[in-house]
Amino acid sequence: MKLLKNNIYINVYLKNKQEIFEFVFKKFKEDGAVLDSFLPAIVERDKAASVAIGNYLFLPHPVYDEIANIQKEKMVFIGLKDVINIDGQPIKFICGLALKGEHQMDALQSLAIAFSDPEEVEKLVKDKDLTQDKVLEFLAKHN
């Protein structure tokens, strides 16, 4: 599953988990990708184990049982206007996943690899002119 340019949002002002979950859900729901049960499923997944994985990345994705209810696979990437703190981690980037089976595992692995180099991630964090194209280049370069 490839991240599409029109699913990348830059300089978004969100200040906490709930706002992030609602924004991600709204973007998926607008496209008919998920059912209403998706929002509580991503909240539940985060309660089981934080989806703030370090290196400025937050990865909302549903509990396993919700995957069968995904109507259309989709990814969204959000670059926050400001770094916020979630579960003791600084967060600047969010990648919401509405993916099934292997696609979800592949995306999680690819994102973990892309965000594994602290120096490269720091460059992305400090980029004041971040664009959708730069995000796509960053992800492609590191996978």
Curated annotation (Swiss-Prot):
It holds the Pfam family PTS_EIIA_2. It is found in: Cytoplasm. One of its GO terms (biological process) is phosphoenolpyruvate-dependent sugar phosphotransferase system. Its main location: cytoplasm. It comes from the Bacteria. The modification Phosphohistidine is found at residue 61. The keyword Transport applies. The keyword rRNA processing does not apply. Residues 1-142 form the PTS EIIA type-2 domain. One of its GO terms (cellular component) is cytoplasm. One of its GO terms (molecular function) is kinase activity. PANTHER family: MANNITOL PERMEASE IIC COMPONENT, PTS SYSTEM MANNITOL-SPECIFIC EIICBA COMPONENT. This is Mannitol-specific phosphotransferase enzyme IIA component. It comes from Mycoplasma pneumoniae (strain ATCC 29342 / M129 / Subtype 1) (Mycoplasmoides pneumoniae).
